Regions:
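Conserved acetyl-CoA-binding loop-helix of GNAT-fold acetyltransferases
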Residues: 125-139, 161-165
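A short helix-loop-beta-strand connector motif used in the catalytic cores of GNAT acetyltransferases and
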Residues: 46-60, 77-82, 113
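Conserved acyl-donor/pantetheine-binding loop and adjacent beta-alpha core of acyl/acetyltransferases
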Residues: 77-112
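Conserved GNAT acetyl-CoA-binding A-motif
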Residues: 110-112, 140-151
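Conserved catalytic-core motifs of GNAT/GCN5-like acyltransferases
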Residues: 77, 149-152, 164-183
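Conserved GNAT-fold acetyl-CoA-binding loop/helix
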Residues: 23-46, 57, 91-94
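Conserved beta-strand-loop-alpha-helix junction that forms the acyl-donor binding cleft
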Residues: 115-124, 150-159, 176-181, 187-189
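A short beta-loop-alpha structural element at the N-terminal edge
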Residues: 2-16, 24-29
């Protein structure tokens, strides 16, 4: 298994994994849109240096030349401009620029926020998610953050238990769409 920084060429595979999370979020705005057009928005986003390395950091797990997992996150202070950049691709994809996909703030101040982490279902249970979580801790430290944060859906207690086993603790509640999430944080050594 190879864990490496994502490149533009990985964007299609990343979008497939990102959609696992999007489906679980069950957002009304997503349900109302043409998903193939929305995939264009996501793909264009994950092709930019801003999403890959500059404002956010995207990492992939690769097995036999296939992207089987990814993580994507950013420092709290970059959240608004990342969302704005993603929204700038709506028109290119044939969607109304007035659509707001992600309106709720997700990150907490002074943290590196793990927005997304997903592993291909065929590859789950082999420690790939754990390796990606370890990588997120390293990325947070490199971004000079002493906290790594993430949101976990109340409907996913298995994931929450996994995060607790990695030293995360519940620091708050956040509502995204119609779902309640616990906001978890872990201290990171710089």
């Amino acid at each position: 298994l190879l864990i490496r920084k994502a490149t533009k060429k990985d964007s299609g595979a990343i979008v497939s994994l990102f959609n696992i999370i999007i489906d679980e979020m069950d957002l009304d705005v997503i349900k109302s849109l043409d998903r193939s057009k929305l995939d264009i928005v996501f793909q264009k986003s994950f092709e930019t240096q801003e999403f890959l390395t500059d404002w956010a950091q995207t990492t992939v797990a690769v097995e036999n030349d296939k992207v089987v997992g990814f993580l994507y996150g950013y420092s709290f202070e970059n959240e608004k401009r990342i969302n704005k950049l993603m929204h700038s691709f709506l028109k290119d994809a044939g969607l109304s620029p007035s659509i707001v996909i992600f309106s709720d703030p997700e990150a907490f101040p002074n943290e590196w926020y793990l927005n997304s982490i997903a592993v291909d279902p065929e590859y789950q249970g082999h420690g790939i998610g754990s390796k990606l979580l370890e990588t997120a801790t390293i990325v947070a430290a490199k971004q000079n953050k002493n906290k790594l944060g993430l949101n976990v859906d109340w409907e996913n207690p298995r994931a929450e238990a996994l995060y607790y086993s990695y030293g995360f603790r519940n620091v708050g509640l956040i509502i995204l769409g119609d779902h309640n999430y616990n906001h978890l944080q872990k201290n990171v050594k710089k």
